[in-house]
């Protein structure tokens, strides 16, 4: 994440609050889109919300048959409008991955067209984590909870997370895999391009920063798939 905790708190203080009555439920199922039953690994390109060609990159990735897209926002008040344009034209679900700390951000995300949100367990006390997961469910969004310890995985399960996001450097630690609830949907978090050989059979999908940062993400996506065949 490129925005610090302190920066996001300041942004939140100045952010307008969406009227929750006008927020419509998501109809694009992120969890279903990435669920490969561990038979394969879905790459989810992570695009920067400030990317000048965001709409074009998203459209071309959809044409390349990505299962889902992720977007990270540095300045939501500026970048959410571009996400809304993408969401209106997209048939694939959108995951928001930047720092979410307050309930209003969940409704803000859905109002912009996101279908899933990434929540970081380390930044959210139990009551807040439960409230944000509940808010996501109320709008039919998937709540993906990023966990770095077995304790955080247990907290995510208690909050009824739709998916567990785990660090992969390049593999997911055995102790984290052992702590997962049965049939948990797993999203691997990598610092660059995921390595399928380390993740196949262990994760359903992986955020791919390298694809999202490429000059032509769709071409990079197709090339990555060709290498796996």
Annotate each language-model stretch with its function.
Residues 99-100, 123:
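Residue-level preference for alpha-helix termini and adjacent loops
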């Amino acid at each position: 994440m490129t925005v610090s905790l302190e920066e996001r708190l300041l942004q939140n203080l100045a952010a307008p609050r969406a009227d929750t009555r006008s927020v419509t439920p998501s109809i694009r199922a992120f969890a279903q889109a990435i669920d490969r039953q561990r038979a394969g690994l879905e790459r989810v390109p992570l695009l920067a919300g400030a990317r000048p060609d965001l709409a074009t990159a998203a459209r071309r990735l959809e044409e390349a048959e990505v299962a889902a897209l992720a977007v990270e926002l540095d300045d939501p008040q500026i970048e959410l409008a571009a996400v809304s344009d993408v969401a209106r034209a997209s048939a694939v679900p959108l995951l928001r991955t930047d720092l979410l700390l307050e309930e209003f951000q969940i409704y803000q995300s859905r109002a912009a067209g996101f279908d899933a949100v990434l929540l970081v367990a380390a930044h959210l006390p139990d009551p807040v984590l439960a409230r944000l997961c509940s808010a996501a469910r109320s709008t039919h969004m998937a709540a993906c909870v990023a966990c770095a310890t077995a304790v955080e995985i247990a907290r995510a399960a208690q909050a009824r997370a739709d998916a567990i996001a785990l660090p992969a450097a390049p593999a997911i630690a055995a102790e984290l895999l052992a702590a997962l609830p049965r049939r948990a949907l797993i999203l691997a978090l990598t610092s660059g391009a995921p390595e399928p050989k380390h993740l196949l059979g262990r994760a359903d999908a992986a955020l791919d920063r390298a694809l999202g940062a490429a000059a032509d993400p769709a071409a990079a996506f197709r090339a990555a798939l060709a290498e796996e065949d």
